[in-house]
Amino acid sequence: MRGKTLISLLIAALLVAGCAKKQAQTGTPTTEKKWRVGVTLLTKQHPFYQELEAAMRETAEKEGIELLIQSAEFNLADQTAQVENFLTSGVDALIICPVDSAGIAGAVKKANAAKVPVFTADIAAQGGDVVCHVASDNVQGGRLAGEYLAKLLGGKGKVVIIDHPVVTSVQDRTRGFMEAISKYPDIQVVDRPPGDGVRDKAMAVTETMLQKHPDLAGIFAINDSTALGALKAVESMGRTNVVIVGYDGDPEARREILRGCALKADAVQFPRKIGSTVVEMVAKHLRGEPVPKLVPIPCDLIDKQKLEREPSP
């Protein structure tokens, strides 16, 4: 009996040694650490953020990251609570697309105190320590939009900006826009009402602007939800002489531009590039590699002629 026991123990020891040797040869650990990263998006309803999220998920899979994605749907209190819940759950890092650039600072500082690295995408945070911000070069995009609108107007006319000034990305867009049209002394920005980046509100605001400024010539819409709301107002009031330049390059806006309506052009962002890049930056940082504080993604501009030459898929 004792002999059989010794033989059994010897066999078990050999099996364990064999497994250890095999593991050493393959270099594959029995369990692989997967980083957990909390993500709070501005919204999941907008095509821009749908593309950004899809690219984040694809890149996270390659980088060995588990993404925990929630959406604030434009609600700062919800976004703050999401960050706090992520911190309580013990995530390795955070990616935030702020609802309000200044308002999110408190949540960022809580993450700093918990020593959880914070990254921002598309919209920057104003306050707290952020490891890396990845976003479109929105100043450049605003310049492209301003130059195009100035060309449409022949260098003169009254313009309104349907604004959303509580987020840094829009602040940058309007700054670039103003830089561009400042070269044209006969173009006058007569109003900058907030439309909150939402179609229905942008439509209502545009209707008010069209009534207030009967000689209005042009509109700069800070995103495509705004542009499409403005377009509906312009068409419903029969003011199709008013031209609109939007921002984002969403599929619906592209279709309207191709239709040949008052929406003439869009500054274009690349949300998939933003989404993939921010996850790559998180992975590098978690591996102990240096990352830049800012990664700007260049913008482009599309109009009917360009879309006809290079149709979107």
Question: Predicted segment positions?
Answer:
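Short, low-complexity interaction segments enriched in Ser/Thr/Pro/Gly
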Residues: 1, 18-19
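Bacterial N-terminal signal peptides that target proteins for export
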Residues: 1-7
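Bacterial N-terminal signal peptides
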Residues: 8-17
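A residue-level marker of the well-folded mature domains of exported/periplasmic proteins
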Residues: 19-313
